[in-house]
Amino acid sequence: MNTQSDSAGSQGAAATSRTVSIRTLIALIIGSTVGAGIFSIPQNIGSVAGPGAMLIGWLIAGVGMLSVAFVFHVLARRKPHLDSGVYAYARVGLGDYVGFSSAWGYWLGSVIAQVGYATLFFSTLGHYVPLFSQDHPFVSALAVSALTWLVFGVVSRGISQAAFLTTVTTVAKILPLLCFIILVAFLGFSWEKFTVDLWARDGGVGSIFDQVRGIMVYTVWVFIGIEGASVYSRQARSRSDVSRATVIGFVAVLLLLVSISSLSFGVLTQQELAALPDNSMASVLEAVVGPWGAALISLGLCLSVLGAYVSWQMLCAEPLALMAMDGLIPSKIGAINSRGAAWMAQLISTIVIQIFIIIFFLNETTYVSMVQLATNLYLVPYLFSAFYLVMLATRGKGITHPHAGTRFDDSGPEISRRENRKHLIVGLVATVYSVWLFYAAEPQFVLFGAMAMLPGLIPYVWTRIYRGEQVFNRFEIGVVVVLVVAASAGVIGLVNGSLSL
């Protein structure tokens, strides 16, 4: 039996120099959240909903994702010593495997998002450089691969260099978005066009409930990254900066998203928006000011995707490295180079990104399919973190067993009853919202997500047995059963041809 404390890795990681300021944390949140999704949101929403349902959807998403943001805000205050919130909160509260599955899902979602970002990047370039057009998918796949390894070379040089690049690209890409809002609001928005078919009764997109349900996956996709500050909590100069950066980043992104999606419905009808290409914001501005508007937005998209690509390649390696430091997967994966970068975790992430590039290329997978699959995987840590906050607010602790909670410093500041009640409301809203999102998702992507999660059992179980430790607690056994059943259903669907990307 290995008696070494599991918290050693996280605590050791916490001892690293804290160099990331609140401005950089906010830039990381906006940089990783305002990626490809915001540029395709007019077409994404227009394909499934009208302007009325869009407003209802943003109201639900705003409340839901704000509750998710506040979950990480509250947990950062209640457990200020825990690093990489998307991983540590679930592990301390619900068990080692739940923490592992949260980090594994977050990592896989980030990997798939990387491929989606790069695909949209080169498809946008294809409008101006025919070599990268949809007529040359092999060339685009090679270009995506080259970009992936180039970014690996950047992030492997350390946090400070990559974070600086993220800050620069975040500032650069916000400018075209602000130009879009100003130009459309004053030159192109028509209230009559916005209200002519408010509920899309002529668009063939179903009932209002179906429309709201349909846009949920896209609203989540464009908000993913809101937890970015908590992931990099161990590099923050101050733990209070983590909480403040999360809220500031959320409000900024929400204002951008609501403005862009609402203004688009005042320029083109729901049917016209649905027919646009992935870079639909460029087409909307082109309809207002001409071709130069499309070029401006395309430039912003390229800068946006580049910044998000760097951010997510940084973010996805972090939980993988911490799991290795904490003994949930082989410790060599957590190797740190002389520049302070988790180079082995970044290398493995880059290799897996390359594998998905090949898989998606062979299956001719669309950008929208990548979005839906990645979104379902991101929901795993959101759900478990929200559930942990509910447990803290109701019983003051998570599930206690020999391999969760007791090996961590589970202490925290004193919380008043009044604050606890507020935290319970936040946790319940975030939990219900996360469950609703799984319901709103298309079933095939839930099953594909389960199949992607299942292989993670191999390194986890092997490492636990090697260390002579208990593999699962009772709650985790239930999680594994659900995972195996869903993955089995997915495999059966693939075999009989009823399931495909």
UniProtKB/Swiss-Prot annotation:
Permease that is involved in the transport across the membrane of lysine. Keywords: Amino-acid transport, Cell membrane, Membrane, Transmembrane, Transmembrane helix, Transport. Belongs to the amino acid-polyamine-organocation (APC) superfamily. Basic amino acid/polyamine antiporter (APA) (TC 2.A.3.2) family. InterPro entries: AA/rel_permease1, Amino_acid_antiprt, APC_superfamily. This is L-lysine transport protein. It is a multi-pass membrane protein. The gene is lysI. One of its GO terms (molecular function) is transmembrane transporter activity. The chain crosses the membrane at residues 25-41, 52-76, 92-113, 138-155, 174-191, 214-232, 247-269, 292-316, 340-362, 377-393, 424-440, 447-463, 477-495. It is found in: Cell membrane. One of its GO terms (biological process) is amino acid transport. Its main location: membrane. One of its GO terms (cellular component) is plasma membrane. The keyword RNA-binding does not apply. The keyword Glycoprotein does not apply.
